[in-house]
Amino acid sequence: VFDDTRGNKKFKMDLEACVVLPDSRLVAFGSGSSPQREKIVTVAPGKGAMAQQMSGEDLYAGLRAHSDPRGARLNIEGAVVQGEWLRLLQRGNGKRGFEPWNAILDVALDKFLGWLDGRHPFPPVRRIFEVHLGALAGVPFGFTDAAVTDDGRVAFLACAEDTEDALIDGPVTGCRFGWLGADDPSVVVAPVVDGEGKPTHLKLEGIEARTGGGTMFDVVADMDRGDEPAQIAELAVRE
């Protein structure tokens, strides 16, 4: 566990974004919000597979070169494969009342695979879509994760966390679920509510689509406290 109480948070790799590649490899991306968090971990399929760590310095340098001209800190929170693209979700953090930089950074999947295997330099970002997620009580929403359903749609989570810094946790005022457009920045969002119909204040930071249906998901809540484990829950989308 990495937190301020233990004094070890600076060593946290912050593997916020995970994706399974077409060859069944699992790739976990550090958020890139600090040099320590510019690492990538891969796990090959098969029994007894070991996790391998590699530097992502050139990857994050390439992403940072395309980041927000307003100076927002790079903070990759989600990754999905959709068609020919590896899509990386940048989470915006900002002051109350200001629009944060939430964006989708698209990299050609075949070029990324070549880089991952050491055959090519890291490919440039080919498409960037800034996404406007709104705010709640003055606190802007920011991406926290994404997943692809069986029918190819990209679902995402966004939380309104009251903090101005990607390295500092803050209270959550609400969460939203949404669908992301394939070739444009359009989104369709809805508030996430609990079993009693009340808006959740949990920090939902993980989502995975269940096999066989595009409206049922598993989600993970990060409690941001070292003495309390993360929670896993079922999310049902009513369309």
What are these regions (language model features)?
Residues V1-E239:
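Sequence/structural signature of beta-propeller domains
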